């Protein structure tokens, strides 16, 4: 990375970032295809790292610019095993390296921005962190009235993406090469089915395109939000996942103050909160239904006129939070009203005070979890445990370790649930499925197998983190034990993506 930074520092004197020559550098592909950083289908091909050289890169780019550069005959694929994995392997190799290169100016600009504002930004790690959602759910969400559940539009024209990236990447040759990639993958951007299949093989490239695309959506939202807040609040900087965010927010503020100074204090708008996760975003407010319809109109209009994206209004749902549940991070969240009766007595007069406390319930979606377990052959569709025949050839310790890892991942991910008793059924299914798999391997019944080895064998491996904490702090006060039995949001839960998307594997 130091070599790359020295290269960009040299070119910065010319007021341009010439990234195109970096494509021909071999160490770029060492970074892009590092097994520890990006485990893609290319890195699984044995001998690929040794073949990523300047000669191959030049040949690939030359063939990409030919007339029929994406057509590979079956005979050529059989003769060369290196190209047999994928017909579009030419462009995939270059696009992954290209995605790594164009991220460099973004990263350097963000670092320089944070260095200049290190005295003003206390928690700079929250600038691009999803962890800020957890305290938001605990503290503020239960006090909101309406929620806009938005499906972010994914259909966009190729040239719109090019125009967006021109503000960040000044190298014309790199943009021309990007246009070649986007013309090939235009069907991936408009077709969700094809995009989900091929984006897994080139995650870095598609993540970069998606984030740069959504980045512009959120910039419009920041402008509208600051308008309703009279430019007095920049708390959205903690929630918005933005690159180079604070410099852009200053420019928006300066333009708005200059042109609309007379209208700043006319209308007082209620508080707005914004969350983005996966392909959805959420706008929540204490305002009225009319206020939320205004925001819906603003968003649809900006997408259609500024980004030339036809967006159906039905993709934005306005829900009253007290009557509808919200699906977020694999949880079903809704607001429950808990009555609380307080008895007060003043001298000889006693009276009761009824208070209604709004609390956010984060529930575990048991039905989708059981459906996922049934798809993976741990149980049937009704939730009755069954053996896992494909694991019967493994060793006993390996079988128990696999079942225990799945059980611990589910407990770890759903530790923020307000009603953890619903997880007992999932643990029961996994525990009994593990016992039946072991009994199938030893050609015995579950009762005989557990009687011979003891049920403690499974309990030791399937013990939840809550039980471990309780055993660790047995001698502490009861108040501390109650803390560990309450909702706990583990910050590494976002790495368990499979539980947030039940279409994936565990």
Swiss-Prot record:
Pfam families (alphabetical): Intron_maturas2, MatK_N
Subcellular location: Plastid, Chloroplast
Assigned keywords, A-Z: Chloroplast, mRNA processing, Plastid, RNA-binding, tRNA processing
Biological processes per GO annotation: mRNA processing; RNA splicing; tRNA processing
Primary subcellular site in the record, as a coarse category: plastid
Any one GO molecular-function label of the UniProt entry: RNA binding
PANTHER family xrefs: MATURASE K
Protein name as annotated: Maturase K
Organism: Ocimum basilicum
Lineage, uppermost ranks: Eukaryota, Viridiplantae, Streptophyta, Embryophyta, Tracheophyta
């Amino acid at each position: 990375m130091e070599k790359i930074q020295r290269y960009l520092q040299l070119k910065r004197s010319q007021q341009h970032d010439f990234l195109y020559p970096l494509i021909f550098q071999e160490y770029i592909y060492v970074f892009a295809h590092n097994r520890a950083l990006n485990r893609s289908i290319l890195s699984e091909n044995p001998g690929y790292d040794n073949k990523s050289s300047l000669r191959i890169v030049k040949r690939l780019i030359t063939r990409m610019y030919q007339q029929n550069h994406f057509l590979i005959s079956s005979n050529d694929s059989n003769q060369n095993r290196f190209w047999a994995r994928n017909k579009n392997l030419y462009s995939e190799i270059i696009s992954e390296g290209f995605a790594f290169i164009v991220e460099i100016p973004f990263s350097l600009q963000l670092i320089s921005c944070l260095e200049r504002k290190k005295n003003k930004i206390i928690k700079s790690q929250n600038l691009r962190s999803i962890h800020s959602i957890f305290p938001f759910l605990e503290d503020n969400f239960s006090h909101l009235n309406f929620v806009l559940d938005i499906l972010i539009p994914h259909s966009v024209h190729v040239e719109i993406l090019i125009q967006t990236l021109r503000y960040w990447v000044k190298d014309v040759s790199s943009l021309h090469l990007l246009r070649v990639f986007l013309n090939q993958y235009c069907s991936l951007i408009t077709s969700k089915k094809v995009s989900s299949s091929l984006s897994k093989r080139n995650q870095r490239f598609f993540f970069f395109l998606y984030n740069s695309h959504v980045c512009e959506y959120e910039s419009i939202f920041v402008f509208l939000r600051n308008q309703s807040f009279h430019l007095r609040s920049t708390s959205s900087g903690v929630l918005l996942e933005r690159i180079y965010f604070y410099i852009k927010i200053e420019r928006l503020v300066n333009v708005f103050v200059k042109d609309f100074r007379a209208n700043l204090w006319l209308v007082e708008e209620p508080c707005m909160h914004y969350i983005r996760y996966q392909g959805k975003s959420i706008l929540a407010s204490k305002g009225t239904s009319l206020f939320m319809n205004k925001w819906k109109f603003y968003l649809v209009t900006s997408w259609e006129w500024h980004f030339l994206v036809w967006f159906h209004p039905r993709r934005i749902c306005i829900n009253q939070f007290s009557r509808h549940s919200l699906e977020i991070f694999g949880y079903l969240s809704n607001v429950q009203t808990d009555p609380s009766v307080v008895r007060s007595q003043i001298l000889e007069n006693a009276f009761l005070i009824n208070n209604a406390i709004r609390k956010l319930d984060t529930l575990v979606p048991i039905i989708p979890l059981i459906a996922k377990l049934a798809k993976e052959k741990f149980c049937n569709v009704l939730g009755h445990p069954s053996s896992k025949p494909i694991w019967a050839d493994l060793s006993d310790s390996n079988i128990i370790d696999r079942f225990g890892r799945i059980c611990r991942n589910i407990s770890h991910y759903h530790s923020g649930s307000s009603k953890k008793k619903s997880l007992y059924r999932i643990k029961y299914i996994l525990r009994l499925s593990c016992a039946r798999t072991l009994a199938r391997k030893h050609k015995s019944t579950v009762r005989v197998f557990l009687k011979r080895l003891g049920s403690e064998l499974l309990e030791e491996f399937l013990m939840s983190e809550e039980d471990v904490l309780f055993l660790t702090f047995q001698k502490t006060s009861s108040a501390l034990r109650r803390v560990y039995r309450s909702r706990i949001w583990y910050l590494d839960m976002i790495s368990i993506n499979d539980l947030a998307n039940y279409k994936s594997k565990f």
